[in-house]
């Protein structure tokens, strides 16, 4: 199993997703590999939203705030909090969905914002 996964990983790095998509059937593992190892456009993710793994996409793909908003019920907020670049306005809008430990550790926050959300900030990171 490990060798097969390693081979797939190398293939994903070497060929574009359009070449892979031409196959009639893709396994869950194939879709996971595509989501993890290929840079996907939001258009591609939108087109195959029912096939992709949203946990992997939320962690490994670069998503715009508008796209995250559009798919707010699909994205994995834990990874959005730490792996996406978020504006303070976006963080305010979705403060109840976000993981504040990762917001505190990975987002670039102004002093005013930190004061405003001092009760949410994880001071131990």
Labelled PLM ranges:
Residues 1-125:
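Alpha-helical scaffold segments
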């Amino acid at each position: 199993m490990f060798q097969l996964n390693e081979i797939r990983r190398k293939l994903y790095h070497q060929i574009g997703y359009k070449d892979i998509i031409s196959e009639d059937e893709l396994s869950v593992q194939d879709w996971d590999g595509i989501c993890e190892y290929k840079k996907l456009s939001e258009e591609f993710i939108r087109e195959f939203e029912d096939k992709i793994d949203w946990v992997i996409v939320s962690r490994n793909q670069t998503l715009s705030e508008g796209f995250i908003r559009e798919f707010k019920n699909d994205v994995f907020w834990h990874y959005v909090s730490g792996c996406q670049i978020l504006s303070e306005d976006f963080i305010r809008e979705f403060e109840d969905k976000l993981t504040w430990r990762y917001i505190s550790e990975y987002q670039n926050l102004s002093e005013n914002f930190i004061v405003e959300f001092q009760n949410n900030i994880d001071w131990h990171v």
